[in-house]
């Protein structure tokens, strides 16, 4: 193994680049989850009744989103957009859960506004976390912020209940759900094949062969070929296309 391959192998193991979950259990630091942690289970009331996270997700992927407050403009557009995109998440075996610290009553009233203004029915549960139990577990409330506002976060949960990624935005900035689908596509691809996805990659684009794969093995794994730009930079067509 060359020095470059040794260095890159070390980087891949440390950086979680291949998407393989770590073996650590849930161990939040300062109420914040780390990539690879097992996410904490919970039961809480919601717009569809009492739900349990693990039972709801089953063996599916999970997209768990928090929003700052019901009856707010950006959140209204976000939850409407997410409802419209639900078929795309279903294609990827991914279930959606939303959360804020508002009541079930507020959720149900607000859902009427979303359906009226965004022209779509809310087709996933919205958790009512009035006691902040879940928000505190997942570090959704910034310590310097109003304690009745959860931050705008997205948690990607794999079928083995591990946190694969987290995106957090301020209340002023709405989420890009096309990017969220892109990230999910990347996880599902790189979990199955020895590739990583480069900058601006979207489903169907060329991929990068991970540096831990030797050229001899790459020839067998990637029969479509791989231009070798550098010893550590080998491009190949997306293997499942």
Curated annotation (Swiss-Prot):
Keyword Electron transport recorded: no
Family: Belongs to the peroxiredoxin family. Prx6 subfamily.
Gene Ontology biological process terms in this record: cell redox homeostasis
A single Gene Ontology CC term: cytosol
Provenance organism: Dictyostelium discoideum
Annotated EC: 1.11.1.24
A GO molecular-function annotation: thioredoxin-dependent peroxiredoxin activity
CDD domains given in the database record: PRX_1cys
Misc. comment: The active site is a conserved redox-active cysteine residue, the peroxidatic cysteine (C(P)), which makes the nucleophilic attack on the peroxide substrate. The peroxide oxidizes the C(P)-SH to cysteine sulfenic acid (C(P)-SOH), which then reacts with another cysteine residue, the resolving cysteine (C(R)), to form a disulfide bridge. The disulfide is subsequently reduced by an appropriate electron donor to complete the catalytic cycle. In this 1-Cys peroxiredoxin, no C(R) is present and C(P) instead forms a disulfide with a cysteine from another protein or with a small thiol molecule.
InterPro entries in the record: AhpC/TSA, Peroxiredoxin_AhpC-typ, Peroxiredoxin_C, PRX_1cys, Thioredoxin-like_sf, Thioredoxin_domain
Coiled-coil boundaries: none
Subunit structure: Homodimer.
Protein name: 1-Cys peroxiredoxin
